[in-house]
Amino acid sequence: MTRTVHCRKYNKEMEGLAVPPLPGAKGTELFNSVSKQAWQEWLQHQTMLINEKQLNLMDLTARAYLTEQMEKFLSGADYDQADGYVPK
């Protein structure tokens, strides 16, 4: 049986993640409030941000930026788009 959660991005019951996406309390929070679909969409958006903005994941500032953008993206707030990206 599929696990469901009330997704905070879409504000409805949706299929949940199979495992917490991050370790610790943050991972548990995401596991309980973010749908599988929303998380997959975030991973795609995160990849675009990393590539287009040439972020170095060894840099703590870049990681903090991605965490901030993740919160905005998953909460339905305004979030940064990848410069120069044109959706198909």
UniProtKB/Swiss-Prot annotation:
GO biological process: one example: cellular response to oxidative stress
GO cellular component, one term: cytosol
InterPro entries: Fe_traffick_prot_YggX (IPR007457), Fe_traffick_prot_YggX_sf (IPR036766)
Lineage: superkingdom: Bacteria
Keyword field contains Iron: yes
UniProt keyword list: Iron
Pfam families per UniProt: Iron_traffic
Gene Ontology molecular function terms on file: iron ion binding
The keyword Transferase belongs to this UniProt entry's keyword annotation: no
Role: Could be a mediator in iron transactions between iron acquisition and iron-requiring processes, such as synthesis and/or repair of Fe-S clusters in biosynthetic enzymes.
NCBIfam families reported in the protein's UniProt record: PRK05408.1
Protein name: Probable Fe(2+)-trafficking protein
Lineage: Bacteria, Pseudomonadati, Pseudomonadota, Gammaproteobacteria, Cellvibrionales
